[in-house]
Design a protein with these regions (language model features):
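Extended C-terminal regions of large enzymes
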Residues: 1-163
């Protein structure tokens, strides 16, 4: 199975619904590094629907920022604990006076630009249809976050959603 032409890696959207949102809405498709919701399993039910779109948006923005800064995804935990580091690093390197909110908007704009390219190229995304119907053992879960709910990822204020 694939999303936007990219094969689904180890994380099944039926058991980690936040990663399913990322696969469907990320400009890169089924790329777990685009916004891996695995770490959210400590703070929210990974098989639940509530909050998954918002969590995916936060993680995708942080992933886009790390990619844009040219740093490895493995340093993300430090940024999750102290997200102001994004602005501090850019300010130190380039002599800017960016706030964390400025940087969040930059990450969001990056994702929206990539998604606009996909739309113009005819690339659309959703999890494979069978994942919405076929239950995954042992919890017998399906991916039940609607396309309409996932589309909200593009209208949620990225700055307000980060805290």
């Amino acid at each position: 199975p694939a999303v936007k032409g990219q094969a689904i890696p180890a994380y099944d959207p039926r058991s980690l619904k936040g990663i399913g949102v990322t696969y469907a809405t990320s400009p890169m498709g089924a790329d777990h590094t685009a916004g891996n919701a695995l770490e959210m399993a400590r703070t929210m039910d990974p098989r639940g629907v509530e909050g998954q779109v918002e969590a995916s948006q936060r993680l995708q923005i942080r992933g886009a920022l790390l990619d844009s800064m040219g740093v490895c995804l493995f340093i993300r935990p430090a940024f999750v604990k102290n997200p102001e580091l994004f602005a501090e690093l850019l300010n130190a390197r380039y002599g800017c006076d960016l706030t964390y909110k400025d940087v969040q908007q930059m990450g969001s704009n990056c994702l929206k630009t990539e998604e606009k390219f996909n739309q113009l190229a005819g690339v659309r995304g959703d999890v494979p249809e069978f994942m919405r119907d076929e239950k995954l053992a042992p919890y017998n879960t399906v991916f039940d976050i609607s396309k309409n709910e996932m589309e909200k990822i593009w209208t949620i204020d990225p700055v307000e959603n980060q805290f």
